[in-house]
Design a protein with these regions (language model features):
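Flexible, small-/acidic-enriched active-site or ligand-binding loops
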Residues: 164-201
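Active-site C-terminal subdomain of aminotransferase-like
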Residues: 7-141, 145-178
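Short beta->alpha connector loops at strand-helix junctions that form conserved
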Residues: 1-4
Length: 202
């Protein structure tokens, strides 16, 4: 999971975290996980699944992978992430509330052809959101498509006054991204559609 997003809340740090419940049977799929089910020469030939059982993955991550990749955040980053955790429930609840209102507004707008948001009853993931999400709240991220395609999306982005244009999402401010001209700008329209990104998507 990215800790840069909601956990931080202000896009001040870059990082990630591993959540491992210790319930996955690595040996049942041994061919897919040779790093856990075969000897690790860098740790005296230990086979993590044999030595650590259900804790095989998290043990490998905190011993061999941290050693090799150096994926340890600085003390300042840890402080900022911990600070962000203090207000996480309040912020996420408000993100969800705000996103729901915006999604409903966009869904009724004549210049919007489609809204992707699991909090809307006509969304293909609505039933799952109601089943699995706390009180049916989904998230703070919405995507929508303007009827005018790429040109309309560019005009929309150029007209923004309150929201910040950014490739980073899920912080405490409202951020907007046009993938066709930002994260996927190297692709032509045909390639965008193949990648599941329409030219007019915001």
């Amino acid at each position: 999971h990215s800790t840069t997003k909601y956990m931080d809340g202000h896009a001040l740090t870059v990082g990630g975290c591993i959540v491992d419940s210790g319930n996955f049977d690595w040996n049942a799929h041994a061919e897919k996980f040779p790093g856990l089910t075969t000897p690790d020469d860098s740790y005296h030939g230990v086979v993590y699944t044999e030595k650590f059982g259900k804790k095989a993955y998290i043990t490998k991550a905190t011993s061999q992978l941290m050693r090799d990749l150096g994926s340890i955040p600085s003390p300042t980053n840890c402080f900022l992430l911990n600070l962000g955790l203090e207000t996480l429930p309040l912020r996420v609840e408000r993100h969800c509330y705000n996103a729901q209102k915006i999604a409903e507004f966009l869904n009724a707008h004549e210049k919007v052809s489609h809204v992707n948001y699991a909090g809307l009853p006509d969304d293909k993931y609505y039933a799952l959101a109601q089943k699995y999400m706390n009180e049916g709240r989904t998230c703070g991220v919405i995507s929508f498509e303007l009827t005018g395609g790429r040109d309309a999306a560019v005009r929309f982005m150029d007209s923004l006054k309150l929201a910040t244009i950014a490739t980073h999402v899920a912080a405490s401010i409202t951020m907007v991204l046009h993938p066709a001209s930002h994260t996927h700008r190297q692709m032509n329209d045909e390639q965008l559609v193949e990648a599941g990104v329409s030219p007019g998507m915001i």
